[in-house]
């Protein structure tokens, strides 16, 4: 079907003028509104004003201009339906064959820190979605464009074939409904947050494609990376890649895990992650010292790992990193000398990210077959006001440092989780075992002689005193755990028996 008449009304005017000029050269009549009409006329394009079509002025500060039978009748009339065509002829309605509309910038408006509620409401588009939906419903007869990126493909098809194919119209219609659904979801989310609704009867979210991925967790799985419509400061989706191969699905998950851990620390810290579990964490007076400790924590598992640091990478740290095979290094920045060292490895991925950014109170979404689980992110850190010491002995100064490190790290280890820390570094990590004492044995075995004098962190309480027994045999001198078991007293007695200082936090950190 030849395009004879187009309705154009856009907020994003990117590449609009040359596109419309070419349409008019092909004999297309253009109807337009407001600022779009003004722009086109200023650039020498003949335009029919929307009021000339509706016979009604634009009113209410532009809130009401396209909601009219002369517009929607021209969009919805099925060309092959004799009754439809007779009705629009009877009422003097002319068919519209092409709709080019994009919407008021609601997302950009609410992204502003100083946005008012009134500003947000005024940027909710009404007429635009109405036209887009009407045209998309009737896509067998109407071509609809919501994205400036589609100007050239549509124009080329019109030039080459004289019309737009049904397949292309379907693709464009599907894109429109995705776009309007995302637009409405963002509005719904904004208003839901304004009124403070915690558990709405429908949960609507919108994500935007960031990049295609080669494959998913395994080569036979397809995958894509999407990011939240509103950027989350300090999130892995906001990281900038400076160097190296394209990120993989597993890279992104591991990098996210590393960022979440290193964010727990204010002092210089380095985190090494493999398969979303930390294999080495260290802190120090400098970032080089912190990385040296993270490396010493587990020299084997760090191979092929992901490193996150919370200070600029300097030359000394870069040289230490360069000596190891790593997949990714994430840091707030890299000195030029560090980049000169690290970019010598062409495949090493270097990412910059403000890992110190305050974590926003996002919801954590976990898919299950046929459903979605939603919970608050576990943002609870070490809080002196919540701790209690049930044992006879209290931790000494160094034990306190190691207990805090173990507690910050164990929160991010797959349950059941046990972490041993000593001298400002992890020395053993026991992850993902079906019983707690099993995880403790793994952490102790990994630590070896370093278990002596170490501090043990547990993500949940001890149902029996066997973990304390294993820790004592290995030389652990301090333990931090939530407490709360009906058999806490058994573990306390066992700790007192061996002179172990035990701290209760009152907070559990399961991670499934």
UniProtKB/Swiss-Prot annotation:
Gene3D superfamilies for the chain: 3.40.140.20, Methylglyoxal synthase-like domain
Recorded GO MF terms: IMP cyclohydrolase activity; phosphoribosylaminoimidazolecarboxamide formyltransferase activity
BP GO terms, sorted: 'de novo' IMP biosynthetic process
Domain MGS-like, residue spans: 1-146
Pathway: Purine metabolism; IMP biosynthesis via de novo pathway; 5-formamido-1-(5-phospho-D-ribosyl)imidazole-4-carboxamide from 5-amino-1-(5-phospho-D-ribosyl)imidazole-4-carboxamide (10-formyl THF route): step 1/1; Purine metabolism; IMP biosynthesis via de novo pathway; IMP from 5-formamido-1-(5-phospho-D-ribosyl)imidazole-4-carboxamide: step 1/1
Gene Ontology cellular component annotations, sorted alphabetically: cytosol
Alphabetized UniProt keyword annotations: Hydrolase, Multifunctional enzyme, Purine biosynthesis, Transferase
Coiled-coil blocks: none
InterPro entries for the chain: AICAR_Tfase_dup_dom_sf (IPR024051), Cytidine_deaminase-like (IPR016193), MGS-like_dom (IPR011607), MGS-like_dom_sf (IPR036914), PurH-like (IPR002695)
Family: Belongs to the PurH family.
Record note on domains: The IMP cyclohydrolase activity resides in the N-terminal region.
PANTHER family xrefs: BIFUNCTIONAL PURINE BIOSYNTHESIS PROTEIN ATIC, BIFUNCTIONAL PURINE BIOSYNTHESIS PROTEIN PURH
Protein's UniProt name: Bifunctional purine biosynthesis protein PurH
Species annotation: Bacillus subtilis (strain 168)
Annotated gene: purH
